[in-house]
Every structure is written in structure tokens, then in C-alpha cells.
């Protein structure tokens, strides 16, 4: 309820600044955009290793709501939305204390990387039935298949947003705000640009640590440079995207 209500308020007020917009509910292309419908709240996208498919995170909801989402892909050749099959094996990549509670999920940010062992790893910020990072091995042929390789439970009261993987299987993740924040405190933070979250680092041996000097107003998207020396972090409320030096 909190996240959905907040977005409704934000878009209501921001709509007064729109000069014009095109109606796309009929899924008709225009001179600028080719429109593809049939997706549920597409939240994040990632190009597959073959560059012939786009992995799509279909957001559901945040707890205590119970609307689940999906992981699907968009075939760039056929221009069709396709399901992704998931097989479940032992927890090898995640936290040993994390267990699979439900095969359904509510995905948010995603990231894909070729690990040091040559396997493709897909990490998914997941909000249901509890706040976790879900870790999958991705296998691409004519379709995309996933093998569940583990999960990591989020720190208490944290709502994650987006994730950036390292080749060793560790990752950085943005915490956008705490789950116990009130709706109006979040609205106030968006107006006065006050800090609501930070970036966490997770490694298999030591778990989560807050990354110093990353606190900001609604940390949102995150990406890691190919040499793993820099993070690119977006702070939604402040309208900033920063380059963060991991070596300093």
C-alpha cells in the first residue's frame, strides 16, 4: 500500500507539469515509439547474453500486499512476451541461512553477469513473500531457463530496489527506504530531499555491510563499471546520479 500510494501521489502532482502526452493504452505505434503490451508493471530490463532477448522483471507489490509478479522475456525476433521456466536446486550462491519460502515472487531490480566460473548469474530484488535477493543461473538456448541457486534475506525493515553484481557473486544493492516509514514521511522526504536509504554490499563470508557515504534521498538504480572500480547510483528524490569510487 505504501509504495503504491506514494507513486500515485507523486504522479498526480507531477502530471500538472506535463505539456502533452500520447495515449498508449490501445497499443498503437506512433512516429516515435513501437509499443508492445501485455506486460505487468515492467520494472527492470536486461539484455540476454545472445542479445536476442530482453529479460523483464514484472513487479507485483511490496509487503504487506500480496500481489505477485513474474520474470519473463521479450523475444526481439518474434516480438512476443515469453515465460521463463525455473528449476530449483541447492542453495550454493546465497546465504546458507536463507531458504526458499515460495516459488512465486515480486521482482524489482535485476542484474546479470558472467561469473568468474563462466556461468551466467541473474540476481533479482524480490519483495514477496519476504524481502530477499534471489539468485539464479541463466541458461540461454532458443529460450531462457533459470536454475535457482540460492537467496539472501534482506536486513530487517529494509526495502531494496536495484542490484549490481560482481563477478565473484557478491553484489551491491540499493535500499530505497525502511519498511516502517509512514506514507507522509516518505512524501515529506520527497519534498525536502531528506535521506531515506543507502547502498549495501553483500559477500558470502561476511553478509551485509552498509557502504559508507552512500546515504541519500531514495537510492534507486545502481550499476557497476566493468572493471568493478566504480558504482553509478541514482537518487530519485534528489534527481542525482553519482559516480562512486570504490577504491577510495
Residue spans for each PLM region:
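A short helix->beta-strand "capping" segment at the edge of beta-propeller domains
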Residues: 18-41, 94-95, 145
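Beta-strand-rich domains and repeat architectures in extracellular enzymes and scaffolds
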Residues: 34-70
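Surface loop/turn motifs at the tips and blade-to-blade linkers of beta-strand repeat domains
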Residues: 35-38, 85-88, 99-102, 151-156, ...
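Beta-rich catalytic cores
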Residues: 41, 67, 106, 129, ...
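Residue-level detector of Asp-centered blade-edge/turn motifs that repeat once per structural unit
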Residues: 48-51, 113-118, 165-168, 226-227
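Short, conserved, GDST-rich strand-edge loop motifs in beta-rich repeat architectures
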Residues: 56-69, 124-125, 173-194
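Blade-loop segments of beta-propeller domains
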Residues: 69-116
Amino acid at each position: 500500500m505504501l509504495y503504491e500510494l506514494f507513486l500515485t501521489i507523486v504522479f498526480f502532482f507531477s502530471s500538472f507539469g506535463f505539456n502533452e502526452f500520447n495515449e498508449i493504452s490501445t497499443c498503437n505505434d506512433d512516429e516515435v515509439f513501437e509499443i508492445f503490451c501485455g506486460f505487468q508493471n515492467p520494472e527492470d530490463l536486461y539484455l540476454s547474453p545472445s542479445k536476442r532477448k530482453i529479460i523483464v522483471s514484472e513487479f507485483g507489490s511490496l509487503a504487506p500486499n500480496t500481489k505477485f509478479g513474474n520474470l519473463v522475456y521479450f523475444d526481439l525476433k518474434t516480438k512476443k512476451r515469453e515465460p521463463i521456466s525455473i528449476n530449483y536446486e541447492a542453495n550454493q550462491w546465497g546465504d546458507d541461512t536463507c531458504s526458499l519460502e515460495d516459488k512465486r515472487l515480486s521482482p524489482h531490480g535485476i542484474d546479470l553477469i558472467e561469473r568468474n566460473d563462466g556461468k551466467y548469474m541473474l540476481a533479482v530484488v524480490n519483495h514477496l513473500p519476504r524481502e530477499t535477493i534471489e539468485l539464479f543461473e541463466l541458461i540461454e538456448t532458443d529460450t531462457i531457463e533459470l536454475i535457482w541457486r540460492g537467496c539472501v534475506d534482506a536486513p530487517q525493515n529494509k526495502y531494496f530496489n536495484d542490484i549490481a553484481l560482481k563477478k565473484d557473486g557478491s553484489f551491491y544493492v540499493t535500499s530505497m527506504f525502511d519498511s516502517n516509514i509512514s506514507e507522509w514521511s516518505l512524501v515529506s522526504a520527497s519534498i525536502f530531499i531528506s535521506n531515506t536509504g543507502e547502498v549495501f554490499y553483500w559477500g558470502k563470508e561476511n553478509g551485509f555491510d552498509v557502504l559508507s557515504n552512500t546515504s541519500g534521498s531514495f537510492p534507486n538504480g545502481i550499476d557497476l563499471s566493468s572493471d568493478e572500480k566504480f558504482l553509478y547510483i541514482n537518487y530519485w528524490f534528489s534527481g542525482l546520479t553519482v559516480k562512486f569510487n570504490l577504491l577510495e
